[in-house]
Amino acid sequence: INWLKLGKAIIDAL
């Protein structure tokens, strides 16, 4: 799992 990509996706969803 790519945590940086996941984190970016979560931030973008906020």
From Swiss-Prot:
Keywords: Amidation, Antibiotic, Antimicrobial, Fungicide, G-protein coupled receptor impairing toxin, Immunity, Innate immunity, Mast cell degranulation, Secreted, Toxin. It is found in: Secreted. GO terms for biological process: defense response to bacterium; defense response to fungus; innate immune response; killing of cells of another organism. Expressed by the venom gland. Could be used to treat biofilm-resistant agents such as A.baumannii and Staphylococcus spp. coated on the surfaces of implanted medical devices, such as vascular stents. GO terms for cellular component: extracellular region. It comes from the Eukaryota. The modification Leucine amide is found at residue 14. The keyword Repressor does not apply. The primary structure of this mature peptide is identical to that of Agelaia-MPI from Agelaia p. pallipes (AC P04205). Antimicrobial peptide with potent activity towards many Gram-positive, and Gram-negative bacteria, as well as potent activity towards yeasts (C.albicans, C.tropicalis, and C.neoformans). Inhibits biofilm formation of A.baumannii and Staphylococcus spp. bacteria. Also shows potent mast cell degranulation activity and potent hemolytic activity of rat erythrocytes. Its mast cell degranulation activity may be related to the activation of G-protein coupled receptors in mast cells as well as interaction with other proteins located in cell endosomal membranes in the mast cells. This is Agelaia-MPI. It comes from Parachartergus fraternus.
